[in-house]
């Protein structure tokens, strides 16, 4: 028996030697694993001709699992606040260690030879990527400069509008002269000084006295109705019984029971028992309170107590005929 070997793709131990890599299950697992890695490799290959440079975000720290090397590889290449998309993955795919591990992986797992070139990056392609990365950095710097210029222009525009507002407020304005009735130009500074001096000096103007409020003015007086004391009803301050301690008249008149009586409870209990029985049973609608006569049962002859059966039968027929004849005569 061949020694036990562990397959990392199938995640199981086998004892068939090299024959396991040719099995259908192993080839299916190998194909699925390569297809999971292939979209990331294809996206990295597209970045060779046109490298993209973006501002760094925490999502750029994402890693992917290299199936050939058996290790994690960073997808993007970050430096400072800049990130080159798929720079880390392309650098790993172009390394000689990855090429050596890929050849070993393909030989051990007997993968398709046509797919091996998709997971390798030649030094020429990586050099082309470096050139496109330089162009991407230049274009990113141009975009950043353009954005900075636009922001600076917007800031200058806001600052200019603010200065215009301040200038329009501080401009000298014409203040009308109340003595001559004509308008004479005065400066804002002079007017401010005049207002300040007038505030400092005590005013000589005689202000009219404030009107004194007469609270005892004559007018329609209020009518005193008197103390509204209900006779016979006390107050808690006078030592009377609180309202919630006084018994109601209905309670005093008759001490009535709360809830149904015991007989009603038994009737209701019996009804609840009958509800559980099938509604289509025999005698479900029978009124037990109705009175029935003694002869309500159907008569099939006399009860056979003693003697012969035919004697009781003949006696019953004779009595029935006599009763029938008697009833017929009564009706006529």
Curated annotation (Swiss-Prot):
InterPro entries: CCDC84-like. Pfam families: CCDC84 (PF14968). Keywords: Acetylation, Coiled coil, Cytoplasm, Cytoskeleton, mRNA processing, mRNA splicing. Residues 190-204 have a biased composition (Polar residues). The modification N6-acetyllysine is found at residue 31. Changing residue 31 to Q: Increases interaction with SASS6. It comes from the Eukaryota. It is linked to Mosaic variegated aneuploidy syndrome 4: A form of mosaic variegated aneuploidy syndrome, a severe disorder characterized by mosaic aneuploidies, predominantly trisomies and monosomies, involving multiple different chromosomes and tissues. Affected individuals typically present with severe intrauterine growth retardation and microcephaly. Eye anomalies, mild dysmorphism, variable developmental delay, and a broad spectrum of additional congenital abnormalities and medical conditions may also occur. Interacts with SASS6; the interaction increases with CENATAC acetylation. Component of the minor spliceosome that promotes splicing of a specific, rare minor intron subtype. Negative regulator of centrosome duplication. Constrains centriole number by modulating the degradation of the centrosome-duplication-associated protein SASS6 in an acetylation-dependent manner. SIRT1 deacetylates CENATAC in G1 phase, allowing for SASS6 accumulation on the centrosome and subsequent procentriole assembly. This is Centrosomal AT-AC splicing factor. The gene is CENATAC.
